[in-house]
Amino acid sequence: VTDGVYDYDGYYSTNPFAVGRSESVDSKSPTSDSVKQTLYSQLLVKYTENSNEVELSSFKDAALNNQITVKDIRNGIRVEYTLGREEVTYLVPRRIRYDKYLNILYQIAQNSAKKKDKRSFAAFYSLYAINADQLDYELDRDSMTADVLDFFYTTREEGKTLHPGKGSEFGVQWGLIPAYYERINSESNKTISERIRDYPFVQQFAFMVCDSTIQASDLKRLEQMVKLNTDYSNEQMTIDHAETEYSASDKIPALFKMAIEYTINEYGLQIRLNAGNVRFDSSNYKLSNISFLPYAGAADTNNEGFILSPDGSGTIIRLEDIKGQQFTTTSSMYGQDYAYHTVSGANKEVMRYPGFGVVETITKKEEYEDTEIYVDENGEEQTETVIKTRDIKSSHGYFGLITEGATLSKLTVVNGGSLHMFASVYTSFNPRPKDSYVLNGGISVGNDSMWTVESKRKYTGDYKLQIFILDNDHSNHIGMATVYRNYLADEGVITKLDQSGSDDIPLYLQTLGALETSKTFLGVPYDTVVPLTSFVRVKEILEMFKNNEINNVKVILQGITNGGLISYVPTDFTIEKCLEEGHDDVKGMTFKELIEYADANNYQLFPDFDFSLALRDELFDGFNAKDDLSKTINDENAIMREYDPVWQAFIKNGCGIISANAMNKLYDGVYAGYKDYNVGGISVQSLGNMLSSDFNEDDPLNREDSRKLIVKLLAKIKEQNGNVLISGGNAYALPYATDIINMPIDDSRYKYSKASVPFLGIVLHSYKEYAGEPINLAGNYSYTLLKTIESGASPYYTVAYDNTAELKEYATYSTLAKYY
């Protein structure tokens, strides 16, 4: 590509080009054909049928059946896939006259390259007759091979000589027709009478019945035998079924239709799969997962290179470290969706940006001429030209970005290890969200049963990947970060910071405001609210910084309204009065006076409001938990869960998940009073780090719906407040945030990770103001400080001035215990 961002040649393949010579890295044994079929696939589709999970691959279940169509579209191609079986019926007669059955079996026995096929076919059929005379049909014995003749006609007596000690194989391995005679002659009169009653036509001819419990996989196998070795046709089968009064009741087989579009744009390669065009029989099958280009850009682990995963700040997985080790890791983009009962992920960092990549370095031997000096037999120096070899390394790779549908996507890193020699990173998704929950409370008997329900709200938009192809000079994580940053800047997601102000980086200071506690008066307990950091204390802290020439301070005022740190759902703007009080002989300060002081000294205030979590609800405040909290798939209120290292599991913390449907209403209630103060900034931390569905019956939201509502709200907040601070920094919130705290500056330190890299820091540096976690709350102060510096992040601290001992009363309250 010579226009746009590229001025070089690069390459990217949807599948590894060396699948044919693939082998396990450890044992050097060739990769099996079934694994190769997966490596050759652009799509892997998982679905459930009768609680059993089945996987289809686009190579085995589409390409090998000639069910792929390629069409030209503008700037690219469209590849249409039909995965599964298009025919509803199998070319396997379910009922057929005895003589016709023998003819089919005879052709299979004579023509099949596999000797066991004739026995496998016969094993699924049972004889229905009323006397031995109906079996008087003779095959052409003269044309039979010895093996086929033995299979059909060897009698039990003859078998004693031909197959000594193998009498149990009579009628199975050999002697099929004599066994049929023995069987019909041994049947009782009662059995014969019942047969005539059930099948009156049996008085005219004997017939064979295929096993009614036969599985689709076996039907497909028998059909292959019939198609490859006989002249039997669907027309003949229709006649046979009519003759034996059989009505077909075959279940419609699993069939999935979808298409991938590949187009070239100014950034490289764009890949699109429309979820609305994924078609299948949803009444019989439940879609579990679609893996999208699972081995695109895969790297050979025999070479050097790495995989970049968006785990936290970014993590590098080196091919040299994982060679021969088979593993798979999967994480959801943007973390947990708390509307689901199933929460996974243990204690790990969240993927805040939907980017990933692979780089592979290939080493080749190159011959070259060199001149060497030597001393001859006369002691004189001579020169000669010699041929030498040297290693030439060249790198190639790509950076992939999910530009649409990221909220419903999962990212998987997979390494073949003992199966094959490739490692890759890819996305997967399910446009039809579903969840499972336990049926109890008397509904089930014995052990609780799991019930799986599919959401009524389906995603019908696009899943889009933008592939940036990297050349040798840019095949590293710096190059990936550069193309990502340039893309975000070109799309208007981020803009350069104004460098005309202070040269100092900002210091983020989060102050803890008011806290409800219990006290006693004359032995009588009562509830009260005490200040941890009053407004006048905030001023004193800022004065201290000013006296030490620290002037670029941004203050996050947490817990200043609606009940303080354990706040009620924000529906209006009411300052906690205790924060405006003075101390000792120092006069108090109103919120408006604090704003005036901050403006005069160029300090930025960010009063914090949580529109995602409901800690407490007050009667008649405009918030209705029944209507405004997100619902789970079984119509329960969605509750946040946090990882507990003691239980090593996710524990409910009692905080309700506010539906994105209700967030705008809550913000409007707060802004009605907040706008009068003209603060110039607002903190809405949770809008940048939490994203959940809502499975309510009336207006359900999938995760993408919630994202759109949150983005719309953030745009409104930005327009009305100017400066907006968020936490975490989910990629969709970047256009509307001026400041980000708690941005990941480390990875999850997985076993297979070589190192964390400051990928996000490289992307956002000089485009956004950001900070990591509060340094003074970190488990390892020095490590966190160094990671802050490495990431180019600003320092961030959380402080409280007075009454800090009150925090210990909330030791079991997860949102506050960390501060004490």
List the model feature ranges, each with a label.
Residues 1-528, 539-548, 552-553:
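Carbohydrate-recognition beta-sandwich/jelly-roll modules
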Residues 545, 685, 788:
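Hydrophobic, well-ordered secondary-structure elements that form the walls
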Residues 552-554, 604-606, 680-683, 723-725:
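Structural preference for beta-strand elements that scaffold enzyme active sites
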Residues 501-665, 689-693:
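Aromatic-lined carbohydrate-binding/catalytic grooves of carbohydrate-active enzymes
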Residues 303, 510-512, 555-560, 725-728, ...:
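A generic structural motif
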Residues 3, 7, 66, 70, ...:
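Active-site-proximal substrate-binding groove within the catalytic cores of carbohydrate-active enzymes
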Residues 470, 474, 528-531, 700-704, ...:
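Hydrophobic alpha-helical scaffolding
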Residues 81-83, 275, 294, 557-559, ...:
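Glycine-rich, histidine-containing beta strand-loop boundary motifs that form or position
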